[in-house]
């Protein structure tokens, strides 16, 4: 009997505990508003960027994330910026806030408005979208051979539909086949019949312009290695007789593959050159570019390349990040006024109408390099 009483006592205590525990259950507010429903036509009080929701904007750029602030901004059925429709899968909407990307598409007609339509109405507010131009910076290798693929570099090629079937790229009057298009470049195959000095002409549905520079530009060519008459560096010239030599871009080139110690100075080009173009390039360096082709088989890290018209200018492509062309020839363009460092032709020492020039590698830490050069030239800016 005593055992039965103890059992009843335990059961009763358990029931009391459960009753007490149930009394501690939290009751949530059934009136919680998740802001996913709208109750009237949409309204917009201001527009900001998605990053800075405190600063009102009236202008935006393609691909920028923006936020509309207002009321009843859910249940969206369409959004247009100018005449470009926004993909609704890219938006985030609650009743008082609507975040979306400005589509990276050129409008055919611009009314400078954003129009939002929901199940309960439509609102239209002013918004100017700044459209970037097609920008061309030139061929990534001006000495690419016929049949090779070369990039016309720049910006917004995809935006302006410089693509196969819609856009065209010409070498002079000869059309090149478009291989690949990205925002930063259009890759084309150098066509049969492309001629030294050809301008590169880019045409699209909404663009028609010429790239700076020319194909195999030999204007102002003062050192192409094939006709070198200097006093040092000939032992680094190659005719691709070694099995590991890269394919040349035009005849002989100089290839330096060795280890240089810290701050070791190494000259590989040194000569006197005729002062061409009536010295105009030195009197007006802002009108000219200094160009050459370069190829690396090992990334260049800390060494600088001296391009010296008695001015001490150093080209240091690896100063911030490693410079590497990945075994491909690339054209390097440096404004001549940067190379000249503000000096004028009259400051340069002459010898029988010639100007001294040398190229060296120096500075930095101990480094193994494998770098090739060709076609040093000073060309007018197009």
Give, region by region, the residue ranges found by the protein language model.
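Short carbohydrate-recognition loop motifs
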Residues: 241-271
């Amino acid at each position: 009997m005593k055992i039965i009483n103890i059992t009843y006592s335990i059961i009763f205590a358990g029931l009391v505990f459960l009753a007490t525990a149930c009394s501690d259950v939290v009751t949530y507010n059934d009136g919680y508003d998740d802001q996913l429903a709208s109750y009237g036509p949409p309204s917009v009080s201001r527009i900001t960027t998605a990053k800075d929701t405190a600063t009102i904007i009236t202008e935006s750029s393609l691909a920028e994330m923006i936020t509309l602030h207002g009321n009843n901004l859910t249940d969206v059925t369409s959004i247009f910026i100018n005449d470009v429709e926004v993909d609704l899968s890219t938006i985030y909407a609650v009743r008082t806030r609507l975040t979306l990307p400005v589509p990276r598409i050129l409008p055919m007609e611009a009314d400078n408005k954003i129009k939002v339509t929901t199940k309960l109405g439509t609102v239209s507010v002013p918004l100017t979208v700044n459209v970037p131009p097609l920008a061309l910076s030139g061929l990534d290798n001006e000495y690419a051979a016929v049949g090779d693929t070369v990039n016309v570099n720049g910006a917004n090629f995809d935006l302006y539909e410089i693509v196969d079937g819609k856009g065209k790229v010409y070498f002079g009057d000869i059309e090149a086949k478009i291989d690949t298009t990205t925002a930063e470049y259009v890759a084309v195959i150098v066509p049969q019949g492309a001629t030294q000095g050809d301008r590169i002409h880019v045409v699209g549905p909404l663009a028609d312009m010429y790239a700076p520079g020319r194909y195999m530009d030999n204007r102002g060519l003062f050192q192409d290695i094939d006709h070198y008459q200097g006093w040092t560096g000939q032992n680094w010239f190659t005719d691709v007789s070694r099995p590991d030599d890269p394919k040349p871009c035009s005849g002989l080139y100089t290839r330096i593959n060795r280890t240089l110690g810290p701050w070791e100075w190494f000259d590989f080009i040194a000569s006197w050159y005729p002062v061409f173009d009536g010295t105009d390039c030195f009197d007006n360096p802002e009108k000219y570019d200094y160009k050459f082709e370069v190829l690396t088989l090992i990334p260049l890290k800390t060494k600088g390349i001296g391009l010296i018209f008695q001015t001490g200018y150093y080209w240091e492509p690896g100063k911030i990040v490693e410079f590497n062309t990945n075994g491909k020839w690339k054209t390097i363009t440096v404004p001549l006024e940067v190379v000249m460092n503000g000096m004028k032709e009259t400051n340069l020492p002459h010898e029988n109408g010639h100007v001294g020039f040398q190229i060296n590698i120096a500075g930095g830490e101990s480094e193994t390099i494998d770098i090739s050069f060709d076609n040093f030239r000073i060309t007018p800016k197009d």
